[in-house]
């Protein structure tokens, strides 16, 4: 199995990985993971929604879209003091990276100062900072970099071919343009996708291929399992199988050996055994907290119990004491 860093993957190669016998695939992914990371250490990330609901985009999976009746109450931007308290709590809980997100289409210039203030608060606690704020221009990205932003999250969700089955208010090229702006501003990219949208295995392969063939691999690759939301067009989508989800984790690890592969949304429905296999297959980051934006997340005490049983350490030892 090749362990070099590549940006020239071809679709037949990626499909071949997806079609490997399961044990061979996850073993190869695990061996690559061990070469680039401590396989018994995991990154813990926290996530705060600074603006909830009312998003003008029509992403068919999202509870925050204004296009659907999801019973979600629209909320204004959080005040800085509330955010400051959340950051301090995250620090006490042993979080490594503090991420914040807003339900809007793109960053507005009038909000730059507010966003930069949040970044400064995060950095003052010696935490990594990550923002997920929609489309971003190069000029805006440079301002966020100057403020100290470490990561910017902008998921591509799925393959280019399947994309318009998911969202029509923003193009695939819009997403790639924002990723390019983030990279040019020398901010680390955080970008991944969602499984269970109705996509094929080839779509999953193409999504990972797009990320792996960027000029710089994303430093973080969140892999989400669809959490069906009542009132959205995808509320009745069938659940992706555990095996297929783990396969995708493994292929992501093989294609992007130096990236953090994050278990993101949907983890609350995963057994300890499934999560253990995901970690073996190369996942080495997870979101911690009882809520991810508007959807439930795994129980905090349950996470500590799982990692303790597996002998997996976190970067911050205080995590197990909080």
Curated annotation (Swiss-Prot):
SUPFAM superfamilies: Radical SAM enzymes. Its cofactor is [4Fe-4S] cluster; [2Fe-2S] cluster. [2Fe-2S] cluster binds at residues 99, 130, 190, 262. Pathway: Cofactor biosynthesis; biotin biosynthesis; biotin from 7,8-diaminononanoate: step 2/2. It catalyses: (4R,5S)-dethiobiotin + (sulfur carrier)-SH + 2 reduced [2Fe-2S]-[ferredoxin] + 2 S-adenosyl-L-methionine = (sulfur carrier)-H + biotin + 2 5'-deoxyadenosine + 2 L-methionine + 2 oxidized [2Fe-2S]-[ferredoxin]. [4Fe-4S] cluster binds at residues 55, 59, 62. Disulfide bonds: none annotated. Residues 40-258 form the Radical SAM core domain. InterPro entries: Aldolase_TIM, BATS_dom, Biotin_synth/BioAB, Biotin_synthase, Elp3/MiaA/NifB-like_rSAM, rSAM. One of its GO terms (biological process) is biotin biosynthetic process. It is an enzyme of class 2 (transferase). Keywords: 2Fe-2S, 4Fe-4S, Biotin biosynthesis, Iron, Iron-sulfur, Metal-binding, S-adenosyl-L-methionine, Transferase. Gene3D superfamilies: Aldolase class I. Signal peptide: none annotated. The keyword Cell inner membrane does not apply. The keyword Ion transport does not apply. It comes from the Bacteria. Its EC number is 2.8.1.6. NCBIfam families: bioB. Belongs to the radical SAM superfamily. Biotin synthase family. Catalyzes the conversion of dethiobiotin (DTB) to biotin by the insertion of a sulfur atom into dethiobiotin via a radical-based mechanism. Homodimer. This is Biotin synthase. It comes from Ehrlichia ruminantium (strain Welgevonden). The lineage of its organism: Bacteria, Pseudomonadati, Pseudomonadota, Alphaproteobacteria, Rickettsiales.
């Amino acid at each position: 199995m090749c362990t070099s860093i590549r940006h020239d993957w071809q679709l037949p190669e990626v499909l071949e990985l997806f079609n490997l016998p399961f044990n061979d695939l996850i073993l190869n992914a695990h061996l690559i993971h061990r070469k680039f990371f401590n396989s018994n250490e995991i990154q813990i990330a926290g996530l705060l929604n600074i603006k909830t609901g009312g998003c003008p985009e029509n992403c068919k999976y999202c509870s925050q879209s204004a296009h659907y009746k999801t019973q979600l109450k629209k909320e204004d931007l959080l005040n800085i003091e509330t955010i400051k308290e959340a950051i301090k709590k995250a620090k006490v809980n042993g979080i490594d990276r503090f991420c914040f997100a807003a339900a809007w289409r793109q960053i507005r210039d009038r909000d730059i100062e507010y966003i930069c203030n949040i970044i400064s608060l995060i950095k003052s606690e010696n935490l990594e900072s990550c923002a997920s704020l929609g489309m971003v221009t190069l000029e805006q990205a440079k301002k966020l970099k100057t403020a100290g932003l470490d990561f910017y999250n902008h998921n591509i969700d799925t393959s280019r071919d399947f994309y318009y089955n998911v969202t029509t208010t923003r193009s695939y090229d819009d997403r790639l343009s924002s990723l390019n702006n983030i990279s040019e501003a020398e901010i680390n990219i955080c970008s991944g996708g969602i499984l269970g949208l109705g996509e094929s295995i080839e779509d999953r392969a193409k999504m990972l291929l797009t990320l792996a063939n960027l000029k710089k691999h994303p430093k973080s690759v969140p892999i989400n399992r669809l959490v069906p939301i009542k009132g959205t067009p995808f509320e009745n989508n069938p659940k992706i199988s555990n095996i297929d989800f783990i396969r995708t984790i493994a292929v992501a690890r093989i294609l992007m050996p130096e990236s953090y592969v994050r278990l993101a949304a949907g983890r609350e429905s995963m057994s300890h055994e499934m999560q253990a296999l995901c970690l073996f297959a190369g996942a080495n980051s997870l979101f911690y907290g009882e809520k991810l934006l508007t959807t439930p997340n795994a129980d905090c005490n349950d996470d500590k119990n799982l990692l303790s049983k597996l002998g997996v350490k976190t970067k911050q030892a205080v995590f197990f004491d909080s």
